[in-house]
Amino acid sequence: MKKVFSSIVLLLVLSLANSFAQNKPAAGTTQKATVPISYGIVVDNSGSFRSMLDRIIEIAKDIVEENKADDETFLVRFVSTDKISLLQDFTVSKDELHRAADEMYVEGGLTAILDAVDFSARHLVEKANSEASRRKLLILLTDGDDRQSKLKIEEVLKFLKDNQIRVYVVGISEEKVSTKIIDRLTKESGGKKFVPKTLSEVPAIIKELSTTIRTP
């Protein structure tokens, strides 16, 4: 009887050891912790994107595809101050966000990047999940050329800092991305700027962005 009992105990120990070995990260690798995020994708729909709109829509969708189960996202399109629209409120549904992205369209107007960021930041504060561990941020897709925002950058930055909202920018342009405003928005809010030299670099940048925004 003792031999049988000893054999059972040995089998249990071996089983637990095997289970631990299977779940243990491989040597030389680490498992990165991630935090849940509440964020808005804020997309420039001004005339300078007329020939690039399809690509911009795909970039927005690719960002959404990186979402984790606990992430919640809203989508804003903008041109001028009076043409800032919430296309999709907070949702965890990738399908809803994809459908909203397909509704984007280019139109004329004096681009108001700062006003769009302020609009989106205030929506984020008002509607986001209030979990303490949840990171709040905005992802801005733009060429960086602000033509006529009513707000000054100092006003926008104060609201971002007061509410611990980080801004990340994917700078896209057929010519040259204007970095004066987006440099301040990203650096002073604790975010980061990504400017691909060619569109072929965008997929890798989206992967890097996804990791960056979710790493504590």
List PLM regions with ranges.
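An active-site-proximal "capping" alpha-helix that borders the catalytic cofactor pocket
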Residues: 55-76
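Bacterial N-terminal signal peptides
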Residues: 7-17
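A short acidic, often aromatic-flanked loop/helix-cap motif at beta-alpha or helix-coil junctions
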Residues: 199-204
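Exposed acidic/Ser/Thr-rich ligand/metal-binding surfaces
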Residues: 23-26, 37-38, 43-46, 54-61, ...
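Membrane-proximal juxtamembrane linkers immediately C-terminal to transmembrane helices
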Residues: 31-35
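Positively charged n-region of N-terminal signal peptides that target proteins for export
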Residues: 1-5
